[in-house]
Amino acid sequence: MTEKLYLTSPMPPSVNHYTSVRTIIKNGKPLSMVYETKEAKDYKKAFKKIIEDEVKKQNWTREVNDTQHFYIDAVFYFDRIDKDCANYEKCLDDTITETQLIWIDDNVALFRPQRIYYDKYNPRIELTIYPVEYVGIFDSDVQKRMFETNCKTCKRYARNCSILKKAIEGRIQPEIHGCVCEKYSEIKN
């Protein structure tokens, strides 16, 4: 069974209200600086608390690493019908990332809006976060382990094979076709 984390986020600021720009004069020249809005800071503070509480309450014990990807299935409850769900992911993902409780960097987050409802009394986003089945270029952990088992009998493995490392990171390489490595060279006894 796949471990899942359920979160309910207040409505984050849209990308239009997440950051703003201020211009200052430095050494007689204008310099534009991007800063996080008060709305974004307030949202992040509130949502981080929710994440921390729910991780403990739901006993989310997954080890955080930089290669595990996660689905984030999102159900939106907007207060108005003129809103676009594509504008609300960034601040939400960044907030989850800042906790460092689920992932290290949101480059592993696969945000998937599932449905949109309208609730003017309680706007929110309900999230279901769970690890994907694939590992790098492999369709499953079983497929990765089979490939890795074969790698252990190759000369390159003892020298920290970069092909295996890149495959686990999800990098497409010309040396691998159909889960077979063209650079495989069996260790001679």
Question: What is each stretch, according to the model?
Answer:
Residues M1-N189:
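Acidic, proline/glycine-enriched N-terminal capping motif
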